[in-house]
């Protein structure tokens, strides 16, 4: 594996970095003061990203994307991730990014016209409704939502929650248990029988649409709503989630990097006990630990991306990266808050926002504990070498 960046990738990285520094970061303050303006700000940022040729870095050229390799995407999304608005400005943020990949791989042409193409343009947002109050999520075998056949269609019944982006989403990919087995359905937000019960109050606030609770009650859909083949819902979920876990890591790496940069800048100008913070060995150790962990996290992401580019499965590598990156970035942000002291817990810097937003990363797309259990089982029972 060659760790150097070719000229094309390096130039693209620099363009994304300039876009984030010059255009995206200056808009953060507006959103921080009024989260209700986020969608308006994002529309303006997406327009500029399109003008700069940075939109849809994760999609193939025939769909209007940049046609990047996974390794190139890792570089781009890390740079975009230096602002919480960055990935959304490129239309490459969760859950839409993962849903785009799934629809591109599995949807038929009619479904692509109705759902994928508007999603690609940034006209609409989407949701992925898998997690349930009774446990389906980390353990998908607990799936309770049902899809009962009626005539030439299905009747969906059940409850979903923590569906990210639910408020304002145009449609949802819903996982329910049919006679053939777990099956995915495409359901419009305003479809009869689908009700957004509430937006769940959570500690993170920078995801447009929040995290919703959805009730499916007598929700009748036709066969055309089935995504892919009936009974393959769990397979499609893994098809979506393995790369999505990795792109989450790519984006959050950028947050860890920026938090550490802010801590370094502060340590170089702030004085205590007759010298700058940067001269205190304890602060030096904290900065060093963040550099060590973020560097290791980046290499894990790049390795998994390299395997994807070779056409290999990355279930094991994606789990390891998800655990390590989520925890490493969380620690880096925590150290940055500690180094900057009172300023770090204020909203005069984005650090307190980063702190709130990064903590859930250890939970969604599989809690660290579930991934550790899976990693351990594969290592023990498949004879994997460290």
Region locations from a protein language model:
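Flexible, small-/acidic-enriched active-site or ligand-binding loops
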Residues: 142, 190-220
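A short, Trp-centered hydrophobic/proline-enriched beta-strand micro-motif
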Residues: 122-131
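Glycine-rich phosphate/pyrophosphate-binding beta-alpha loops
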Residues: 96, 136, 161-167, 205, ...
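A short core secondary-structure module
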Residues: 144, 157-197
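Short glycine/proline-enriched turns and hinge-like loops at secondary-structure junctions
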Residues: 68-69, 138-141, 165-170, 207-208
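A short, charged helix-loop
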Residues: 212-237
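Alpha-helical interface subdomain recognition
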Residues: 1-87, 93, 106-111, 118-123, ...
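Hydrophobic, small-residue-rich alpha-helical packing segments that form membrane-like cores
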Residues: 135-139, 154
């Amino acid at each position: 594996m060659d760790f150097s960046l070719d000229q094309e990738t390096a130039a693209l990285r620099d363009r994304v970095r300039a876009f984030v520094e010059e255009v995206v970061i200056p808009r953060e303050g507006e959103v921080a003061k009024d989260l209700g303006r986020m969608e308006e700000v994002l529309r303006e940022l997406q327009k500029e990203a399109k003008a700069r040729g940075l939109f849809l870095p994760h999609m193939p050229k025939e769909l209007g994307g940049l046609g990047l390799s996974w390794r190139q995407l890792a570089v781009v999304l890390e740079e975009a991730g230096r602002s919480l608005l960055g990935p959304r400005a490129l239309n490459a943020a969760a859950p839409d990014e993962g849903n785009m990949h799934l629809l591109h791989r599995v949807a038929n042409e009619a479904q692509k016209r109705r759902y994928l193409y508007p999603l690609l343009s940034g006209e609409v947002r989407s949701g992925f409704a898998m997690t349930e109050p009774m446990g389906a999520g980390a353990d998908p075998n607990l799936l309770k939502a049902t899809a009962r056949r009626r005539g030439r269609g299905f009747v969906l019944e059940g409850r979903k929650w923590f569906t990210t982006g639910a408020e304002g989403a145009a449609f949802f990919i819903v996982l329910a248990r049919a006679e053939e087995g777990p099956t995915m359905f495409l359901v419009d937000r305003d479809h009869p029988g689908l009700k957004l019960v509430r937006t769940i109050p959570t500690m993170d606030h920078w995801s447009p649409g929040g995290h919703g609770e959805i009730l499916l009650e007598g929700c009748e859909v036709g066969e055309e709503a089935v995504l892919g083949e009936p009974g393959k819902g769990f397979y499609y979920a893994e098809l979506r989630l393995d790369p999505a876990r990795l792109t989450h890591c790519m984006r959050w790496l950028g947050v860890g990097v920026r938090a550490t940069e802010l801590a370094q800048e502060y340590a170089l100008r702030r004085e205590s006990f007759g010298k700058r913070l940067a001269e205190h060995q304890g602060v030096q150790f904290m900065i060093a630990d963040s550099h060590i962990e973020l560097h290791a996290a980046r290499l894990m992401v790049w390795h998994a991306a390299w395997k994807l580019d070779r056409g290999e499965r990355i279930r094991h590598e994606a789990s390891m990266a998800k655990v390590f990156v989520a925890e490493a970035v969380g620690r880096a942000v925590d150290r940055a808050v500690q180094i900057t002291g009172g300023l770090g817990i204020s909203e005069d810097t984005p650090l307190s926002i980063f702190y709130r937003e990064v903590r859930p990363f250890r939970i969604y797309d599989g809690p660290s504990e579930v991934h550790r259990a899976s990693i351990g089982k594969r290592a023990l029972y498949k004879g994997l070498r460290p």
